């Protein structure tokens, strides 16, 4: 599995840029604020339609543009893939793999897997639970399509429930729908908790082994 090339149009500070990667190791160098991290972000976004940095899609669209397009040429599972994602202000994003439209981000699972590490990852330890959930969401969405589907549905229900509570003062009858929303959110939440617990268990085993090797067996790392 490898990313052979990437083309960006109006993504972050890239008006139009195409980059071809070597099949082995690639080192990206440049001055500050030249777009090195933006390029890595684009690669991650092509893998799972989730950004490790942006909280909203419009943050990734250039200030002077209405839409952004990302295209990745990927070799995976013995064949070539072209992954395309289009982001638009005020419109739903469009995704496709080999020109076949994707209905949800989980449809990208398994085409390109990425591992993103940056200095901000120290927030996993120093910051609150939100940073750790974001890390797990980004990782699990690439590995388990069912997790990504449950996460998308949970967020949709959460947003809808928030609107109900906001408008209930003027329309009290909206509150009648809350029990159904609570049940469906609990069902999606159970799926998320199940996968997160399994992920933490596997990560704890690998992390303990790696730390044991780094410390010469003098220290034992545990995750909880």
PLM regions: where:
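An accessory alpha-helical subdomain
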Residues: 120-217
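Conserved P-loop NTPase catalytic core
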Residues: 223-224
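Short hydrophobic/aromatic segments of transmembrane alpha-helices and their interfaces
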Residues: 2, 42-43, 113-116, 182-183
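Regular, well-ordered alpha-helical segments
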Residues: 45-48, 163
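Pre-Walker A-like glycine/lysine-rich segment at the N-terminus of P-loop NTPase domains
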Residues: 1-45
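Phosphate-binding site recognition
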Residues: 15-16, 20-21, 44, 53-61, ...
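Nucleotide-state sensing region of NTPase/ATPase domains
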Residues: 48-131, 137-147, 204-209
């Amino acid at each position: 599995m490898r990313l052979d090339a990437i083309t960006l149009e109006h993504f972050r500070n890239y008006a139009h840029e195409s980059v071809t990667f070597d099949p082995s190791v690639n080192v990206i160098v440049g001055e500050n604020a030249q777009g090195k991290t933006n390029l890595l972000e684009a690669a991650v976004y092509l893998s799972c339609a989730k950004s490790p940095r942006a909280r909203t899609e419009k943050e990734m669209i250039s200030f002077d543009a209405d839409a952004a397009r990302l295209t990745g040429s990927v070799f995976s599972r013995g064949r070539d893939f072209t992954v395309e994602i289009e982001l638009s202000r005020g419109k739903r994003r469009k995704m496709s793999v080999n020109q076949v439209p994707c209905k949800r981000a989980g449809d990208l699972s398994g085409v390109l897997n990425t591992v993103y590490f940056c200095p901000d990852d120290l927030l996993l330890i120093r910051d609150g639970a939100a940073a750790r959930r974001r890390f797990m969401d980004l990782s699990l969405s690439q590995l388990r399509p069912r997790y990504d589907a449950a996460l998308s549905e949970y967020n949709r229900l959460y947003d809808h429930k928030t609107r109900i509570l906001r408008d209930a003062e003027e329309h009290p009858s909206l509150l009648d729908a809350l029990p159904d929303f609570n049940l469906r959110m609990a069902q999606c939440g159970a799926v998320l908790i199940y996968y997160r617990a399994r992920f933490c268990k596997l990560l704890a085993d690998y992390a303990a082994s790696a730390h044991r090797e780094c410390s010469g067996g003098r220290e034992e790392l545990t995750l909880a």
